[in-house]
């Protein structure tokens, strides 16, 4: 099973690199030739227009154009194999100055984009879509419509070179651990996906126990008579004047918290979700997501997240990512700084009179409140820095939210969080102020900054904080009910969201790695590989009373999850390098790796080009060996831990170019091409 998955993964990965290196593309003789162009007036169901009422748009192609006002208009094309294609419309949109929502359906599955105002013919990018082998129907539906279509072009997708993403931290003073983690992320990006799982925070996954405080004996005891150590600094008094300790600790080190409702002690099962992953797949995720939302100045309480993060990295060798659901008072106008508030009177949503712009204005209560928020956060991050724990830090996430509800696509009217409800300008100022305070005021340099982006329209790129302000960009995928491309209305959505992946890649000109920082359903491995959706990592949200994102069969296909976790494509906790956080500033001495190219200091003289596994024959397993050696050097490289790692002879054989320019993914593709008789090795 795993061997078969590896072979399929290798083929898909290698073919994905073909486009970025300018290599061949195959077209079946009886299939549509690409790029394919069709005039708007020739679409099925279209009518011929030469002007939009009194508005003329000159220089159209063909006899005229069509105007999307009534029913669907469509065309069909044949493709030789499942794959990704780009749809471009040469069109115009003169109805709405703020842009107009448009829908293209591919075999009934809908994709959406906002088309800007254009009173002359303009190329509108509808993104990448997956077409299936054989006949495909592409339709433009009149949901909002009123788009003029001169012609439509369908092209084979051109995949950008993912290797140009930087592993240089935006913080010039980044800690060695942060630098090392970034370099590792870069080493697997575009070749593998890292598994992740979000952990619940605060009072989540509360488990009730039989432990009670006995005032007569002054002990915490459970129904079996086991005694628990009282936290002497946690004594308090209830409304009836009875003393009790808020916390006690069991023989196994578990801390329990007093429940005022039931007068017993409870604990939070923060490991519930990763244990579920272990149960379903036999593996633990490599990344665990945390949140600092409990450290709000209104009700700050220590839920132990910092200690759990230290344990995850220093004891388990796992990678930490963290978001910051920081709350503000719902009625800021009635709030006195320092006043404690119940959680119910605070929010992280946009339903507050908190003026976000005032976080940058000295003398305002918002400015001082934000300072308290950052102080609480920094106190936790400093403990992590002192413990040598780097963090993929994702503050102010999901900034854009939904598309704007006004004519200004960047005004924040679609945002659902307070930090972005006042638009892109204020959002970027807030991001910069947080980053500057953490780095300059608190001396925090263990953070790998990650920004959430969406792809509702070309204006979505306006939310990007800039190359010098973030290290990664990410997308949060929640689409089991809406925005599906599989024709279903419920159940797990295994779509890879490839179009969005490459939209985000385009926003940053390929300079940053792109992750799926949150998700409901994990995309299927086959979708990711066939579509070349090389997300850096995935990270499902946690199980809760509201939604069972991990265990719920309406969110996850557990068979697909198991197959992905046990494939060579997916990196799990046990596959992370033992020295992951230790070599941020140290060069590699055995091999040299640059942009996916591996060279060795010495090479054997007897070379059988392409025979990477040294079995005296050239086949697809050699391509697999090359890709494994490049993607996971600690396991399959020259000194890898796996018994089947590549040897010096294998590395020499794998370099299929006579110029001996080092081993790259292009060599894996060359092996595949030689296997099917397209070329002869070596390459001259």
Which residue ranges define each predicted feature?
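Hydrophobic core
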Residues: 13-17
């Amino acid at each position: 099973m795993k061997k078969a998955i590896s072979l399929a993964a290798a083929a898909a990965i290698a073919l994905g690199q073909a486009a970025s290196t300018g290599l061949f593309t195959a077209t079946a003789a009886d299939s549509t030739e690409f790029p394919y162009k069709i005039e708007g007036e020739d679409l099925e169901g279209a009518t011929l227009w030469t002007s939009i009422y009194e508005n003329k748009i000159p220089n159209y192609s063909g006899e005229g154009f069509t105007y999307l006002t009534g029913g669907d208009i469509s065309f069909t094309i044949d493709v030789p194999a499942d794959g990704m294609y780009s749809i471009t419309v040469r069109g115009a949109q003169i109805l709405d100055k703020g842009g107009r929502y448009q829908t293209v359906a591919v075999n009934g599955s809908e994709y959406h984009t906002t088309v800007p105002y254009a009173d002359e013919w303009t190329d509108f990018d509808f993104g990448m879509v997956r077409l299936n082998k054989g006949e495909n129907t592409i339709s433009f539906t009149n949901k909002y419509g009123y788009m003029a279509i001169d012609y439509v072009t369908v092209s084979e997708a051109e995949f950008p070179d993912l290797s140009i993403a930087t592993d240089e931290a935006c913080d010039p003073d980044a800690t060695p651990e942060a630098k090392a983690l970034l370099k590792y992320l870069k080493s697997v990006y575009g070749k593998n996906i890292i598994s992740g799982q979000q952990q619940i925070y605060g009072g989540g996954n509360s488990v009730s126990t039989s432990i009670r405080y006995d005032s007569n004996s002054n002990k915490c005891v459970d129904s079996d008579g086991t005694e628990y150590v009282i936290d002497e600094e946690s004594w308090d008094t209830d409304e009836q004047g009875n003393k009790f300790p808020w916390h006690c600790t069991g023989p196994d080190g578990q801390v329990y918290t007093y429940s005022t409702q039931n007068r017993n002690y409870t604990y939070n099962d923060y490991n519930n979700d990763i244990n579920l992953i272990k149960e379903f797949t036999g593996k633990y995720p490599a990344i665990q997501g945390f949140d600092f939302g409990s450290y709000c100045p209104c009700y700050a309480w220590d839920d132990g997240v910092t200690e759990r993060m230290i344990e995850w990295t220093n004891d388990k060798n796992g990678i930490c990512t963290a978001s910051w659901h920081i709350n503000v008072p719902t009625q800021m106008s009635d709030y006195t700084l320092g006043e404690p508030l119940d959680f119910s009177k605070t929010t992280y949503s946009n339903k507050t009179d908190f003026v976000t712009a005032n976080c940058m204005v000295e003398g305002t209560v918002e400015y001082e409140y934000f300072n308290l928020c950052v102080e609480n956060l920094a106190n936790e991050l400093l403990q992590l820095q002192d413990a040598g724990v780097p963090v993929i830090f994702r503050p102010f996430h999901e900034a854009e939210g939904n598309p704007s509800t006004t004519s200004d696509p960047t005004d924040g009217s679609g945002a659902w969080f307070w930090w972005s409800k006042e638009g892109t300008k204020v959002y970027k100022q807030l991001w910069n102020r947080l980053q500057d305070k953490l780095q300059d005021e608190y001396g925090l340099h263990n953070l790998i900054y990650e920004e959430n982006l969406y792809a509702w329209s070309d204006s979505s790129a306006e939310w990007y904080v800039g190359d010098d302000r973030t290290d990664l960009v990410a997308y949060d995928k929640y689409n089991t009910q809406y925005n599906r491309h599989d024709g279903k209305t419920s159940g797990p959505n295994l779509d890879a969201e490839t179009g969005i992946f490459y939209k985000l890649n385009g926003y940053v000109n390929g300079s940053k790695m792109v992750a799926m920082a949150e998700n409901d359903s994990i995309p299927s491995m086959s979708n990711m590989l066939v579509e070349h959706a090389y997300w850096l990592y995935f990270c499902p949200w946690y199980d809760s009373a509201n939604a069972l994102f991990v265990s719920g069969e309406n969110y996850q296909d557990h068979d697909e999850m198991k197959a992905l976790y046990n494939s060579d494509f997916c990196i799990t906790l046990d596959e992370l390098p033992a020295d992951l956080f230790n070599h941020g500033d140290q060069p590699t001495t055995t091999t040299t790796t640059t942009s996916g190219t591996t060279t060795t200091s010495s090479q054997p003289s007897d070379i059988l080009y392409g025979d990477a596994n040294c079995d005296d024959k050239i086949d697809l397993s050699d391509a697999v060996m090359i890709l494994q050696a490049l993607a996971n050097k600690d396991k399959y490289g020259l000194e890898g831990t796996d018994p089947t790692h590549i040897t010096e002879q294998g590395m020499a054989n794998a370099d299929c170019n006579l110029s001996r320019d080092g081993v790259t993914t292009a060599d894996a593709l060359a092996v595949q091409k030689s296997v099917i008789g397209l070329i002869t090795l070596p390459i001259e």
